[in-house]
Amino acid sequence: MGKKATDHHILSVILGNGGHFPAGEPQSGVGSWDVFTKVGGDIGISHSWQAGLSYWSAPDVQDRTGASHAHDGATETAAFSGSSHIAGLDFVYKWAPRGNPEQRNFKLQFEYFQRDEDGDIVMQGSDPLESSSYTGKQRGWYAQGVYQFMPQWATGVRYDRVSTDNQGSDDAILEEASLNNAEYRPERYSAMLQWKNSEYSRLRFQYNLDRSTGEDDNQFFVQYTFVLGSHGAHTY
């Protein structure tokens, strides 16, 4: 007979005062809120999965400061006031023969986020005071797969990408605030081979094709990781 599914469901709601990025100044009441849920379970005895949704919102951000620069001897700092919202999606799939990952296993992982903002940018310290309307949309996602083909060996690939679409009434002010980057589409391809000596040490060889600057950047890494002392159990 097949193994009984072990489904799980998690729901969480968090209220905050809006005093941490990407919100702005703390408020006396509820300045931000966050809700997320995760569901998952087993498919037979060799497969399992988990999916999650999250949403964060700060409807009244006040004076969130960001990029600054010197102009004619004075320092100008970009401050955003308006609304900010972030939505996220994540998914994990795991495979192991008859539920035993010691010899072979595979893990597929995906995550996506999107931030939407609407409000105004003010260059604090400018004289006369400079401002611009601002509507921004930033997206990012990655997908990766790791296959352990022997007890001590694993290989994997990964793809990352982010994009922006920022609009406003004054492009010069958005550029000063480091927000005038509608054509910015950085991406990266990665591949790795890993040898695990034990639970506490591993050696990884990794190659990245990084296009975050618009140019091809070939990167090679050799990484050795080890753990000293006891450590907690791994999460899903």
Regions from the language model: what does each represent?
Residues M1-K4, V39-G41, Y93-W95, Y147-F149, ...:
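Residue-level signature of outer-membrane beta-barrel architecture
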Residues M1-V61:
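Aromatic- and glycine-enriched pocket-lining scaffold segments that form the walls
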Residues K4-H9, D42-A51, A96-F106, Q152, ...:
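Short loop/turn motifs that connect adjacent beta-strands in outer-membrane beta-barrel proteins
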Residues S12-G16, Q50-W56, Q109-F113, R158-D160, ...:
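Transmembrane beta-strands of outer-membrane beta-barrel proteins
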Residues G29-W33, S83-A87, K137-W141, R185-Y189, ...:
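Residues that define the transmembrane beta-barrel architecture of outer-membrane proteins
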Residues S46-L179:
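Detector for outer-membrane/organellar transmembrane beta-barrel domains
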Residues L89-F91, W195, D217-Y236:
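Outer-membrane beta-barrel "beta-signal"
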Residues A182, P186-L203:
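C-terminal structured "cap/appendage" subdomains that terminate the fold
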